[in-house]
């Protein structure tokens, strides 16, 4: 984001039922956590935001299986600073994916973040 390096760690947890996504950056005071879970025929995410709220989104997989697009469902917690509104994950290959996140600021002003992520060993 803004040319700065971030590290995203993903791991399967809860007996294989949940995927945890943690984003860390050298200049970040805290790490936002996003949890993904399959709920029937859809994928849900809950984003534990450093804005002190927890938006939920439902994902839709593209017909080619390369893009997972998440749309806002609801949010709990503090809304003073805004909330995460939308996320898109584009899968390039097994070691490379892109994440696009939209944070809805107060006054309905969107702020976009783009991450081009590659697996490291």
Regions found by a protein language model. Give the residues of each.
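Hydrophobic small-molecule pocket/channel-lining residues, especially in calycin-type beta-barrels
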Residues: 1-121
